Amino acid sequence: MNDLPEPTRASVAGNIERWTKANREYGDAHAQRQWLAEHITWGQFGVREVDIGSPLGAVAGLDILEAGCGVAYLSAWLARRGARPVGLDPTPAQLATARRTQTETGIEFPLVEGIGESLPFPDAAFDMVVSEYGASLWADPYAWIPECARVL
């Protein structure tokens, strides 16, 4: 992360601080319920997928990166539908909650500590990148969008 511009480093540090607090106040207590929900909700308005149809289409057999996974409920949902997700997040507390929830639910997939602005994956590593409430809202779009394109 030291090779990133100072504004990006400061933004990442602020996001980690905010999401550590959010995890303590909400995410940690609700992770298992979110992981096991039959239908996911999208974005800050909580739009139910069942009401809008799946914006992702068929995901079985796809390698999917969730950029800014938080407690990784979307990655869990993808795994339950036969995808091979990888959850990426910069916040250790949220990843710890996700790992605990993996143990509780038996739903396994890789969880990686990292940032959308500098993805730790090789070129063309994924079939799809999703960001339900993560990188798309909190990361520098001039950095994370090209990074996501690179790994597709």
Task: Describe every region a protein language model picked out.
Residues Q32-L62:
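Conserved alpha-helix/loop element of class I SAM-dependent methyltransferases that forms part
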Residues A58-V59, D123, I145:
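A short, aliphatic-rich alpha-helical micro-motif
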Residues D63-S118:
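Class I SAM-dependent methyltransferase SAM/SAH-binding core
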Residues E117-M128:
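A short acidic, Gly/Pro-enriched loop at the edge of an enzyme's catalytic core
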Residues M128-Y142:
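A short SAM/SAH-binding and catalytic strip from SAM-dependent methyltransferases
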Residues Y142-L152:
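A short glycine-rich, Lys/Arg-flanked "PGG" loop and its adjoining helix->strand segment in the class I
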